[in-house]
Each structure stands twice: as structure tokens, then as C-alpha cells.
Amino acid sequence: MLLDGRKTADILNEALRVKVQYLTKKPKLEIILIGNDEASKSYVKGKLNTASNLGMEVHINYLDEAIDQLSVEALIQKLNTDKGVHGILLQLPIPKHLDSDYLISLIDYKKDVDGFHTMNQGLLFQKKDGIRPATPLGIMMLLDFYNIPIEGKHVVIIGRSQIVGAPLSKMFLDRNATVTITHSKTKNLPSITKQADILVAAIGKPKFVTKDMVKVGAVVVDVGINRVDKKLVGDVDFEHVEPIASYITPVPKGVGPMTICALAHNLYALYLKQEKE
């Protein structure tokens, strides 16, 4: 059965839209887009469309690819102090001459809609209230929408990034799952993935997960977005894995829409916190 991220996001977003219309002012998101990366432009367009449809305000700061570090830092500091701005998002990747880690650390963690700031990462790992990274949050929202049990399940995550793998592992742990994280140095990977009740692929390698790596009846979550022969494909060989999986996310229309959905919910949460202060 498909885990339909597009359909789920539409339903959850509609519920959020109703909440937003009763707010005294619109939650506002500032997006910083540096350079002309076509994939980044596409992602930003999706975020803009979703937020606008929800009654939220979005402003995109288009910056030249050759912009210097200090200029980006100055923009972030300006947005940090603007009380009319509730969320700030630095669209990744950015040009290599810029320090993305430092720029993310400059964003006020109370406006960190992506959940990448070290403060929000720390709050997650201390099991305290904070903004969760959007892709892991979107995955959890999707599994919950389909009432997929998590407690007591063996979750195997392929990929250990700070954006997906590491925070997602903690979110599963907090739901009482048994979690195994695998990566490029893991030996005998198929023998591990085949034990998974829930298998998450987040490595950026097209069709990496094959049928022989998946247990019959497993739930398969494909985070990958890879362009092959002008088509988008995931990290999972969908055609051959889908028949043996109990649930599986497609690419596209799987995790992607849920990431944007989670971003919108994060912006709403940031708005509520800031308006209380």
C-alpha cells in the first residue's frame, strides 16, 4: 500500500489552514536563496505555494551566487531582530565559499523553521520541547496518519546525516522503537536491513535498496530524490520492492510533500511561541 505523502499533506495542511485563518496576523517566513540551483528554486517554489495557500506570508531573498559571507550574516541578523518575521530558512545547498554551518548557527533558534540549529538539535536529544527537523517530522506525521505502529518495532535507517538520519533515529527512540543506524562503513548491510520492520533509506543513491534487502511486510520510507534520465527516482528500487512491502512511499509524492507540510507546521508553532513572549 502506498504511503501517499501528497494526499496526507493536503489533509493536514487543510486542518492547519483553518487554524491560521483565526490568527490575528499572518505567520511570516523569510527564505534565503543563494545562487541559481534549479533544484533549490523548485523546492522554494513548493514551500512558497504551500505557505501561501495556508494563509501564511512568505518572502524570498534572492542573493547572487558570488555574495560574500558577511553580507549573508548581516541579512540573517536583520531578520533575527525583525519582530514581524516568525521563521527563517536558509535554502541548502549554498555556494561552497560560504560556511553553511556557521550561517545556520546565526539564525535565532526561536525562528529556526528547519530545526537545524544546534539548540533545537540539543532540545530534541534531551527530549525537550523544540522545533524538529522538517523531513524527520514529516516522516513521523506520515506514519502516524496511516496508524503505523512504532513502539517495539525494529527501525533501520540507512544514512546518518544531521538533517535526516540522526534526528530521525532519536524521534523513533522517543516512540520506543529499537533503532539501528547504518552508513557507508556498515558491513553486511543487507543482513541488517532485512531485519527491519520499518526501513528508511536516506543516502542519495538511486535505487540502492533492492528487493533482497527488504523483509516481506516491511514498511519502507524512501527519502531519496535522485534525477536519472530526466526522471525523479528514490533510493529504493520501487518497482521490485513495492510488491513485498506492506507500505511504501513513492518518489515523488512521498516524503517531499510531507517535508513541506512539516515546515508549515513548524512555522505555525514558532508563531505561537513568539506571540506569547
Swiss-Prot record:
GO terms for molecular function: methenyltetrahydrofolate cyclohydrolase activity; methylenetetrahydrofolate dehydrogenase (NADP+) activity. PROSITE patterns: THF_DHG_CYH_2. GO terms for cellular component: cytosol. This is Bifunctional protein FolD. Catalyzes the oxidation of 5,10-methylenetetrahydrofolate to 5,10-methenyltetrahydrofolate and then the hydrolysis of 5,10-methenyltetrahydrofolate to 10-formyltetrahydrofolate. The lineage of its organism: Bacteria, Bacillati, Mycoplasmatota, Mollicutes, Acholeplasmatales. Belongs to the tetrahydrofolate dehydrogenase/cyclohydrolase family. It catalyses: (6R)-5,10-methylene-5,6,7,8-tetrahydrofolate + NADP(+) = (6R)-5,10-methenyltetrahydrofolate + NADPH; (6R)-5,10-methenyltetrahydrofolate + H2O = (6R)-10-formyltetrahydrofolate + H(+). It comes from Acholeplasma laidlawii (strain PG-8A). Keywords: Amino-acid biosynthesis, Histidine biosynthesis, Hydrolase, Methionine biosynthesis, Multifunctional enzyme, NADP, One-carbon metabolism, Oxidoreductase, Purine biosynthesis. Pathway: One-carbon metabolism; tetrahydrofolate interconversion. InterPro entries: Aminoacid_DH-like_N_sf (IPR046346), NAD(P)-bd_dom_sf (IPR036291), THF_DH/CycHdrlase (IPR000672), THF_DH/CycHdrlase_cat_dom (IPR020630), THF_DH/CycHdrlase_CS (IPR020867), THF_DH/CycHdrlase_NAD-bd_dom (IPR020631).
